[in-house]
From Swiss-Prot:
One of its GO terms (molecular function) is heme binding. InterPro entries: Cyt_P450, Cyt_P450_CS, Cyt_P450_E_grp-IV, Cyt_P450_sf. Heme binds at residue 392. Cytochromes P450 are a group of heme-thiolate monooxygenases. They oxidize a variety of structurally unrelated compounds, including steroids, fatty acids, and xenobiotics. Disulfide bonds: none annotated. The keyword Heme applies. Pfam families: p450. This is Cytochrome P450 BJ-4. It comes from Bradyrhizobium diazoefficiens (strain JCM 10833 / BCRC 13528 / IAM 13628 / NBRC 14792 / USDA 110). CDD domains: CYPBJ-4-like (cd20614). Its cofactor is heme. PANTHER family: CYTOCHROME P450 26, LANOSTEROL 14-ALPHA DEMETHYLASE. The keyword Ion transport does not apply.
Length: 447
């Protein structure tokens, strides 16, 4: 199938001596091809234009995209800013850690990160909270016999996040509805009229923020209680830096957003890979039987190397965050390419996670690259979680819940004598932007 490129825009041109990929449409640029066929678009651009080229992201403007491995160093560079993220999606990411650098980023991060480290998660009993929720969900899958996997993992992740926040069961439908409306801000056109996505998304964000402020007040009134939100508020209040509650609320909302879509996608891909590679399923079942129960503490995760390898290899082959954006604050060089001050940059993690320059046999889904390694995990192996000051604070939480999910799935299905099986094709319907996920229609059977 041809890529979704504009056949009337074939002119080759340069911006700052860097080629622009032909085929952009008016208003939306290259977004149709980025959303539906990003890997092929990057390969074609590299083959015809080289390692550096401009892609048109429509409302977000032109981003200089680099496939040179030296571009990864920009993620830690002091003269590269994350502020572009807020410029692209101010309604969602304004005031959050992902869009900040320097002192503001450090102050906010230091104020809340302790609750998300292994010790904080263990003290808050997060593993004990998640385990029965995960077991109940995969038990329902077994009883039903087949599921639309991405929809199910998305619902499970929302259930876990809402349980993390202590939202009462009777309030869950309202939160589900507002959360779905909040997500519209990711792609909302900049038109603020009643009934349109921008207006609905802003109203949902304000509704969610108001409830989060109520959680913060309740946490302060009951300071002796444990739980992730209580621990985050307690750590925030003990911080040496005088920060407003707006900072805390914005970053709890970020936890809600970041913990759902990308993790649900990874979870769905894990099930898909288990369904299409019987040997992986057999290895996971063997490990789950040996462990005997869903782990609840980070200290227990070392007993589950197969589940951990499945989590890491899935993230490598199917990165849920395919692109990172930054802005050059001064003139830089990537390899031999000069990058002018103020250039908006795109660093395609999707390309680097499957690059032969960085990984052996990159197109093969191989748990052995994790199970047989003797050296520590490298920063390049965890690109999905960022690097340097912007390393994802939710890393340990994601690691815990995905290993828990693997073990619960294997124990539950093996007990019934069934295994996951693909009931539909995988490649058609994949999406790559703003986050990547498998087709919404993929069905998995358990038989």
């Amino acid at each position: 199938m041809d890529m979704l490129l504009n056949p009337l825009n074939r002119r080759h041109r340069l911006r700052h001596d860097i080629p622009v990929v032909p085929g952009a449409f008016p208003l939306v640029g290259h977004l149709p091809a980025v959303v539906c066929d990003l890997p092929r678009l990057l390969r074609r651009a590299e083959r015809t234009l080289g390692s550096h080229f401009w892609l048109d992201f429509g409302p977000a403007g032109h981003l200089m995209t680099s496939l040179d491995p030296d571009a990864l160093a920009l993620l830690r560079h002091k003269d590269v800013s994350s502020g572009l993220i807020e410029d692209i999606a101010p309604e969602l990411f304004g005031g959050t850690l992902v869009a900040q650098d320097g002192i503001a980023h450090r102050q906010a991060r230091d104020a809340i990160q302790a609750a998300l480290l292994p010790k904080g998660l263990t003290l808050a009993g997060i593993g004990e909270l998640f385990a029965p929720v995960i077991r109940a969900r995969v038990q329902r899958w077994r009883e039903r016999g087949d599921v639309t996997i991405l929809r199910e993992t998305g619902d499970l992740m929302l259930k876990l996040i809402f349980s993390l926040m202590g939202i009462p069961a009777q309030d869950l439908p309202g939160w589900h509805r507002k959360y779905r409306q909040l997500l519209q801000l990711i792609v909302a056109p900049p038109v603020d009229l009643p009934g349109l996505p921008l207006r609905r998304g802003r109203a949902a964000r304000d509704w969610i923020d108001a409830r989060l402020r109520e959680f913060v007040r309740a946490a302060r009134e009951h300071a002796s209680r444990t739980g992730l939100i209580n621990d985050m508020v307690s750590a925030f209040d003990r911080s040496d830096d005088a920060l407003s509650d707006d900072v805390l609320v914005a970053n709890i909302r970020l936890l809600l957003l970041g913990g759902h879509d990308t993790t649900a996608s990874t979870m769905a891909w894990m099930v898909i890979e288990l369904a299409r590679q019987p040997g992986l399923w057999d290895a996971l079942v063997e490990e789950a039987q040996r462990v005997g129960a869903v782990p609840t503490r980070h200290a227990d995760l070392a007993q589950c190397p197969v589940a951990e390898a499945l989590f890491r290899e899935t993230l490598r082959v199917h990165p849920a965050t395919p692109l990172l954006v930054r802005r050059a604050l001064r003139e830089l060089r990537i390899g031999q390419q000069r990058i002018p001050t103020g250039t908006d940059l795109c660093i395609p993690l999707l390309h680097f996670s499957t690059s032969a320059l960085l990984h052996e046999a990159p197109d093969q889904f191989r748990l052995a690259r994790w199970l047989q390694r003797t050296e520590p995990i490298r920063p390049v192996d965890m690109l999905q979680f960022g690097t340097g000051p912007h390393f994802c604070m939710g890393y340990h939480l994601v690691w815990l819940e995905l290993v828990q999910f693997c073990i619960a799935l294997a124990l539950t299905m093996h007990e019934a004598g069934v295994r996951p099986r693909l009931l539909s094709g995988v490649e058609k319907g994949r999406r790559y932007y703003p986050t990547a996920h498998p087709s919404m229609t993929i069905r998995i059977g358990f038989s």
